[in-house]
Amino acid sequence: MAEVRVGKNESLDSALRRFKRSCQKAGLMAEMRKREHYEKPSVRRKKKAQARNKKKRYA
């Protein structure tokens, strides 16, 4: 979980910006998007195989 401490003279906007950046670095937004809808394990495997084939094709 991302945590940001707000300084005495720090504006809320800059603290929010730092929080968003830390969430981005931690990969929370991508994880949230991935878990937004349930994905069956078979579909997950199929997508993983397609990504692997695509990567192999362009490598």
Curated annotation (Swiss-Prot):
It holds the Pfam family Ribosomal_S21. One of its GO terms (cellular component) is ribosome. InterPro entries: Ribosomal_bS21, Ribosomal_bS21_CS, Ribosomal_bS21_sf. GO terms for biological process: translation. Residues 31-42 have a biased composition (Basic and acidic residues). Residues 27-59 are annotated as: Disordered. Residues 43-59 have a biased composition (Basic residues). It comes from the Bacteria. The keyword ATP-binding does not apply. Gene3D superfamilies: Ribosomal protein S8. Keywords: Ribonucleoprotein, Ribosomal protein. One of its GO terms (molecular function) is structural constituent of ribosome. NCBIfam families: S21p. PANTHER family: MITOCHONDRIAL 28S RIBOSOMAL PROTEIN S21 (PTHR21109), SMALL RIBOSOMAL SUBUNIT PROTEIN BS21 (PTHR21109:SF22). Belongs to the bacterial ribosomal protein bS21 family. This is Small ribosomal subunit protein bS21. It comes from Carboxydothermus hydrogenoformans (strain ATCC BAA-161 / DSM 6008 / Z-2901).
